[in-house]
């Protein structure tokens, strides 16, 4: 059984978020939370919040035991880009792309659910 949580349009570049997601992918939920608390990156608190939401979804919606859960999937996709301009010399301007992320975390207890035909 799986439970999932998504945070959309987070104002951190996906490349930076993926660095932290790589640390928790495949880990036990408790271990992943401990790693996030000690990781000194801007995306850590946001990812921790999404992970806690996924755990709460698992417990509330599917009656799963949160102690047995493992981070099955953790990925960051690119969200909408905010385009800004920086004035440069001689009347020119250069583009600044402020990138956003969609963060998705899926937790699983390792048990397969019965599929209906």
Swiss-Prot record:
Source organism superkingdom: Bacteria
PANTHER family, per the entry: CHLOROPLAST 50S RIBOSOMAL PROTEIN L22-RELATED, LARGE RIBOSOMAL SUBUNIT PROTEIN UL22M
Gene (UniProt): rplV
Name of the protein in its database record: Large ribosomal subunit protein uL22
Subunit structure comment from the entry: Part of the 50S ribosomal subunit.
InterPro entries in the cross-refs: Ribosomal_uL22, Ribosomal_uL22_bac/chlpt-type, Ribosomal_uL22_bac/org-type, Ribosomal_uL22_CS, Ribosomal_uL22_sf
Keywords from the named record: Ribonucleoprotein, Ribosomal protein, RNA-binding, rRNA-binding
GO molecular function terms noted in the UniProt entry: rRNA binding; structural constituent of ribosome
Family of the protein in this entry: Belongs to the universal ribosomal protein uL22 family.
One GO biological process term: translation
Function, in words: This protein binds specifically to 23S rRNA; its binding is stimulated by other ribosomal proteins, e.g. L4, L17, and L20. It is important during the early stages of 50S assembly. It makes multiple contacts with different domains of the 23S rRNA in the assembled 50S subunit and ribosome.
Positions of transmembrane segments: none
One term under GO cellular component: cytosolic large ribosomal subunit
NCBIfam families per UniProt: rplV_bact
One Pfam family named in its UniProt record: Ribosomal_L22
